[in-house]
């Protein structure tokens, strides 16, 4: 194996580990959401996340937390609160694989928001593919089916919130340290969650607390794994592997919750995945032309 292939293989390996961690997050969130309210899950998740990040703040020094954009951090925290509580609630009522497929639609929402907030010019082919992708999203949600649950729309609210976070990150991440972005987001989200969590409070068991701690730590772990992956391979090279998360989620959901993806979820995935892949590669092509 030559050095280039070895580096590529290791980079993809790091990326696959991030997918496993992401799927594990959904599984833990679903399990916790069966008893604890999503507000309480969000509170503990980001409370523990801020605790885990404290040693890094101490190590890199207080200057790491200096920011000239406190309102941006507050906005990110609010979006994280809406996104994560909606996502956790959605997981409590829907299969994990459905959530995974809907998460693939986030780039579609990001593309639309980029037009309004980043003044990006979008070629007509990407608009067509985006519309096709949303058709896949509608198929996954099954709004006209007799067994349609309107609460599934919480996933859509979460996807929009995460897309807005992507827009903010694109605009400000180069102007803020990674530690400050993570720490302030965790603190703000935890604080915002307190009133809502208190209203639906159920004292977690020791096992639930352990899962909540792992959930709070995993956000930083996923970021670490992604940074390791992207230090070895181009982000675009990892795009096709992103959709292996559906396989990982399906296996985990089957053995833990006895869930199996229904036809609508699979049909939606067949449409959404090519659409988002086209958007990712066309964005890469557009960026290379600018360079």
Swiss-Prot record:
InterPro entries the record matches: EamA_dom
Domain EamA: 21-141, 160-280
GO BP annotations, alphabetical order: amino acid transport
Any one Pfam family match given in the protein's UniProt record, by short name: EamA
Keyword Cell membrane belongs to the record: yes
Keywords in alphabetical order: Amino-acid transport, Cell inner membrane, Cell membrane, Membrane, Repeat, Transmembrane, Transmembrane helix, Transport
GO cellular component: plasma membrane
Regions crossing the membrane: 4-24, 41-61, 74-91, 98-118, 121-141, 148-168, 178-198, 206-226, 237-257, 260-280
Membrane topology: Multi-pass membrane protein
Subcellular location: Cell inner membrane
UniProt KW Manganese keyword: no
Family: Belongs to the drug/metabolite transporter (DMT) superfamily. 10 TMS drug/metabolite exporter (DME) (TC 2.A.7.3) family.
Role summary: Transports S-adenosylmethionine.
Listed name of the protein: S-adenosylmethionine uptake transporter
Organism for this UniProt entry: Rickettsia bellii (strain RML369-C)
């Amino acid at each position: 194996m030559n050095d280039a292939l070895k580096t590529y293989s290791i980079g993809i390996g790091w990326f696959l580990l991030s997918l496993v961690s992401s799927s594990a997050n959904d599984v833990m969130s679903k399990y916790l959401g069966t008893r604890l309210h999503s507000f309480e899950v969000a509170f503990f998740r980001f409370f523990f996340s801020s605790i885990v990040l404290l040693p890094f703040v101490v190590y890199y020094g207080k200057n790491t937390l200096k920011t000239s954009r406190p309102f941006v951090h507050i906005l990110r925290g609010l979006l994280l609160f809406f996104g994560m509580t909606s996502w956790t609630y959605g997981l409590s009522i829907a299969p994990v694989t459905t959530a995974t497929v809907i998460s693939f639609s986030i780039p579609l929402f990001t593309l639309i928001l980029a037009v309004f907030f980043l003044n990006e010019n979008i070629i007509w082919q990407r608009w067509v593919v985006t519309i096709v992708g949303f058709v896949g999203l509608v198929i996954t949600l099954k709004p006209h089916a007799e067994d349609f649950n309107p609460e599934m729309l919480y996933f859509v609210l979460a996807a929009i919130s995460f897309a807005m976070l992507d827009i903010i990150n694109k605009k400000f991440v180069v102007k803020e340290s990674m530690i400050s972005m993570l720490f302030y987001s965790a603190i703000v989200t935890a604080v915002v969650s307190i009133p809502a969590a208190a209203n639906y409070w159920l004292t977690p068991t020791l096992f639930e607390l352990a899962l909540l701690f792992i959930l709070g730590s995993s956000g930083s772990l996923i970021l670490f794994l992604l940074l390791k992956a992207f230090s070895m391979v181009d982000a675009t090279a990892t795009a096709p592997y992103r959709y292996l998360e559906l396989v990982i989620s399906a296996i985990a959901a089957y053995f833990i919750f006895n869930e199996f993806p229904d036809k609508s979820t699979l049909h939606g995935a067949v449409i959404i995945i090519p659409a988002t892949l086209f958007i990712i590669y066309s964005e890469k092509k557009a960026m290379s032309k600018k360079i």
